[in-house]
Regions:
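Domain-level signature for proteins that mediate thiol-based redox and metal-cofactor handling
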Residues: 1-154
Length: 154
């Protein structure tokens, strides 16, 4: 019975965390983005998207606030930098949400250019390796002429 209660609690904590938005891309939750690495009895383990990410403290605070509001005051939020976060940890749902929001998800290995999230054209070009946040690059579609962000692979 104790094991079943822990499974239920773990699932409820995951559901709580799925409601915590990423502060830089609020259409994604911290679960969608793959920042939450583990939920164990009494502990949530997170990894920021990169060492020194300015949003890390905000994410920790928002997670803590959500856990407290859901009644999980005894759950610790811990940060691990190793292994480092990778775009491979973005969930399929997260990738779909990025695309629907107008941000091209990270490219697959060997892919040379992202499809335009506005019109779907593969005729795109990089404008700047640096986008609106350190995690994004600025691209433009040659078919519809719309600029868009690409979530960088790392």
């Amino acid at each position: 019975m104790v094991a079943a209660a822990r499974v239920d609690e773990t699932g409820a904590i995951w559901a709580t965390l799925a409601s915590v938005p990423d502060p830089e891309i609020p259409v994604l939750s911290v679960v969608d983005l793959g920042i939450v690495r583990a939920v164990e009895p009494g502990r949530v383990l997170i990894t920021p998207t990169y060492t020194g990410c300015p949003a890390t403290q905000v994410i920790e605070r928002d997670i803590r606030t959500a856990l407290d509001a859901a009644g999980y005051r005894d759950v610790r939020v811990e940060t691990a930098l190793s292994p480092p976060w990778t775009t491979d940890w973005i969930t399929p749902e997260g990738r779909a949400k990025l695309h629907a929001y107008g941000i091209a998800p990270p490219m697959a290995p060997g892919q040379r250019a992202p499809a335009c999230p506005q019109c779907g054209s593969a005729e795109t070009e990089e404008i700047s390796r640096f986008g609106s946040t350190p995690c994004k690059a600025l691209w433009r579609c040659r078919a519809c002429a719309e600029p868009f962000d690409l979530f960088k692979c790392h």
